[in-house]
């Protein structure tokens, strides 16, 4: 007798794929909604980055691999949905380096310091995006923009790092870690 598809794939795999799908949908929804909000400051490129809450959530409560998948899907689909394919180079570079930084930091920092890892990740994210912009435009002077981006990264990174444990209490997903 042939096994059902659920038994062939495995219950844990189905739950994992479902969790990744749900979190990707949440991240994309947040991304689209945030793109409709007018800039909070008159400095180009500064935004809240609220969809990063979902990636950091996945990193902490699911796995680095799941966070990576969600990040890739969100950034790729977000650039397609927004019609800004060029955004992919900036967002993917910044997002991947941010995720890698947070993965390393979270191996050594207690979960209560998630906000600190998020701030450092946000600074790395912004630095990577400016580096990509400098390479693409051949304009090294763009690095003079960094002090503003670092201030923004400290504020948004802290908010995102503090929002993840709060969001955990409102989501029911199979996770690998407790708050």
Language model features: what each stretch is:
Residues 12-20, 48, 52, 87, ...:
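Residue-level signature of transmembrane alpha-helical entry/exit and packing/kink sites
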Residues 20-24, 29, 70, 91-124, ...:
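Short helix-perturbing small/polar motifs within transmembrane alpha-helices
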Residues 143-160:
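Individual transmembrane alpha-helices with interfacial aromatic-anchor signatures
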Residues 169-175:
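Conserved small/polar residues in nucleotide/adenosyl-binding loops
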Residues 38, 129-133, 160, 164:
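Alpha-helical transmembrane segments and their lipid-water interface positions
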Residues 50-64, 101-106:
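Generic transmembrane alpha-helix motif of multi-pass integral membrane proteins
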Residues 31-48, 73-102, 136-141, 145-146:
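Interfacial aromatic-anchored transmembrane helix boundaries in multi-pass membrane proteins
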Residues 2-58:
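Hydrophobic transmembrane alpha-helices
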